[in-house]
Amino acid sequence: MLYRYGKDNNGRPVKKAVVYTREEHLIPAYKIDPDAFKIVQRLKDNGYTAYIVGGAVRDLLIGKTPKDFDIVTDATPSKIKRIFRNSRIIGRRFRLVHVIFGLKIFEVSTFRSTIDGSVGNSFGTIDEDVMRRDFTINALYYDPILEQVIDYVGGVRDI
């Protein structure tokens, strides 16, 4: 088990998240949709952070095949659109991108923040994004390249 650290107000390191390795989470690579993998890979190749998030991670951890794969990144919708020609920006309150592969649509959103109390396009960090998710089991992030589950809020324990 690994840990992800941040800093407190005094600059001291504080544990922020538990990182589960492939040997610990046992998610088989073949259960990851190859197009979802490509989206994460291409975002990373362009210098962005990207993860599979939410219900797909929960389903993978309990041995189910997810019905859809949502992806979250630090790239803004306009940057995502530039990387994927096969995409369209949707939404009024919070803009996100649908990336289309054949008949499959992948929802790619930017990390969101609720720090200022807004519900619209308030982009944030992964630390802020995790706090706005509905349940701990839907606040799990999976990096399919490194094969790591990142858990900020005890979602793995709650499963």
Region spans (language model):
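Catalytic cores of the polymerase beta-like nucleotidyltransferase superfamily
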Residues: 1-159
